A protein has these predicted regions:
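Short acidic/polar alpha-helix capping motifs at helix-coil junctions
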Residues: 1-4, 40, 57-61, 134-136
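Alpha-helix-loop-beta-strand connector modules within alpha/beta enzyme cores
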Residues: 4-26, 62-85, 101, 129-133
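Aromatic/hydrophobic pocket-lining residues that form the small-molecule binding cavity
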Residues: 7, 11, 32, 65, ...
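Histidine/lysine/aspartate-rich catalytic loop segments that bind and position anionic ligands
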Residues: 23-76
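Active-site beta-loop-alpha junctions enriched in small/polar residues
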Residues: 30-32, 50-54, 81-82, 86-92, ...
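Catalytic cores of alpha/beta
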Residues: 32-42, 85, 89-104
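Glycine-rich phosphate-binding active-site loops on the catalytic face of alpha/beta enzymes
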Residues: 46-58, 103-122
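C-terminal helical cap(s) of enzyme catalytic domains, especially alpha/beta-barrels
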Residues: 61-62, 116-137
Length: 137
């Protein structure tokens, strides 16, 4: 993810440019609260949490795997930012992430959805993802 502190000047300029065109800005970051605070200083509307480490560590200890994401999402929320998440999310790990961080606005799911569709079919796969994304509704 972006280092929002090291690249603050560039990201601030890009946020201003996109906002001037009416485009919402989300900055992709690693799960570090200071990166969320940095994204807020840059003028972003949202962050997107890079969830590869969560997905990798989820089978080992889901509470430990989600902890840095919860802290970072809280920092984002405290800063007035929306929260997105994405990378390696799937039918196994998505629901727990959304139950733990219920204020996640959007998730990005790509490869896993297509892989699941090979086994379950596309309609069933989309249905299963919708069930998991509506856990807090």
């Amino acid at each position: 993810g972006w280092n929002t502190i090291e690249h603050e000047a560039f990201l601030t300029e890009m946020c201003s440019l996109f906002h001037s065109k009416g485009i919402r800005v989300s900055i992709f970051i690693d799960p570090l609260p200071e990166m969320a605070y940095g994204a807020a200083r840059c003028g972003a509307d949202r962050i997107e949490l890079y969830t590869a480490a969560y997905a990798e560590n989820y089978p080992l200890n889901r509470e430990e795997a989600v902890a840095p994401y919860l802290r970072t999402a809280q920092a984002a929320r405290d800063s007035g930012l929306g929260v997105n998440a994405g990378h390696d999310l799937n039918l196994d790990n998505l629901e727990y992430l959304l139950k733990t961080i219920p204020w996640i606005d959007e998730v990005s799911i790509g490869h896993a959805l297509i892989c699941d569709a090979l086994y379950l079919g596309l309609e069933k796969t989309v249905h299963e993802y919708l069930i998991r994304t509506h856990v807090n509704k």
